[in-house]
């Protein structure tokens, strides 16, 4: 069984880079905006920075959180949240990613919120993905590919995945229990194959399997902001070799 990735936050040596990326991104927020809040350690820093602006500048905005964890943090720092069932257009979505290839295709879902994160990105007028340089890869697949699967018939879905050449493990919590997403589903972390030259094809193939809710590939219009150890930030908007 695969374990749910643990948050390290300030113990991460790239923590200052995540903070800098978050501060750069929060400057994009303008009064009256609806802001999509991603999940994960970098999105956490963005939420904290946005909360500071709401508090110190009396910034009037609304936000939609992609996970229960992000929702609780946003509430704690005073960010007004929109009922997610009322979600329509989102002016700005800020999130992170687990991997980004040279075509800006991504793998997301290390925190288990991939389905809601992708709905936010689909609704976003402007999507900004914040990553540090470790997340840049020549080909997707170094990080496991999360697949969100409905509990009903999940063993059958796993059997079909294995027959098609996708092998992995069911994600567990640190307590050794089956990880359950905010939507009440499971996560199957695919380890093999470990390289996806054409993720669009894999995504189409996987989504045809009944019981699969969503796949961790993200092929969406988004800006990717990359933070480097030297303190620089590079903003990528289209195919760009590293």
From Swiss-Prot:
Keywords: Isomerase
Gene3D superfamilies: 3.30.70.260, 3.40.50.1360
Residues of the signal peptide: none
Residues involved in substrate binding: 39-42, 95-98, 108-111, 135
GO BP annotation list: pentose-phosphate shunt, non-oxidative branch
MF (Gene Ontology): ribose-5-phosphate isomerase activity
Active site residues per record: 117
EC number: 5.3.1.6
Superkingdom as given in the UniProt entry: Bacteria
Pathway stated in the Swiss-Prot or TrEMBL entry: Carbohydrate degradation; pentose phosphate pathway; D-ribose 5-phosphate from D-ribulose 5-phosphate (non-oxidative stage): step 1/1
Catalytic reaction list: aldehydo-D-ribose 5-phosphate = D-ribulose 5-phosphate
Group of enzyme by EC: isomerase
Similarity annotation: Belongs to the ribose 5-phosphate isomerase family.
Function: Catalyzes the reversible conversion of ribose-5-phosphate to ribulose 5-phosphate.
Subunit structure: Homodimer.
HAMAP family according to UniProt: Rib_5P_isom_A
Protein name as catalogued: Ribose-5-phosphate isomerase A
Organism encoding this protein: Chlamydia trachomatis serovar L2 (strain ATCC VR-902B / DSM 19102 / 434/Bu)
Underlying gene: rpiA
């Amino acid at each position: 069984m695969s374990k749910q990735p643990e948050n390290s936050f300030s113990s991460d040596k790239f923590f200052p880079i995540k903070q800098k990326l978050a501060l750069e991104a929060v400057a994009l927020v303008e009064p009256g905006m609806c802001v999509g809040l991603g999940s994960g350690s970098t999105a956490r820093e963005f939420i904290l920075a946005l909360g500071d602006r709401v508090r110190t500048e009396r910034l009037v905005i609304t936000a939609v959180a992609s996970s229960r964890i992000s929702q609780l943090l946003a509430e704690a720092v005073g960010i007004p949240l929109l009922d997610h069932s009322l979600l329509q257009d989102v002016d700005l979505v800020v999130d992170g990613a687990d991997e980004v290839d040279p075509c800006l295709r991504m793998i997301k879902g290390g925190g288990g919120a991939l389905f809601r994160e992708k709905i936010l990105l689909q609704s976003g007028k402007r999507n900004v993905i914040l990553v540090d340089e470790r997340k840049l890869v020549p080909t997707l697949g170094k990080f496991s590919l999360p697949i969100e699967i409905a509990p009903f018939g999940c063993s059958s879905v796993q059997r079909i995945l294995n027959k098609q050449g996708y092998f992995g493990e069911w994600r567990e919590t640190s307590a050794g229990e089956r990880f359950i997403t905010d939507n009440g589903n499971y996560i199957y972390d695919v380890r093999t194959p470990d390289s996806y030259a054409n993720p669009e094809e894999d995504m189409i193939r996987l989504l045809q399997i009944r019981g699969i809710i969503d796949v961790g590939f993200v092929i969406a219009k988004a800006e990717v902001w990359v933070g480097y150890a030297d303190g620089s930030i590079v903003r990528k908007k289209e195919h760009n070799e590293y």
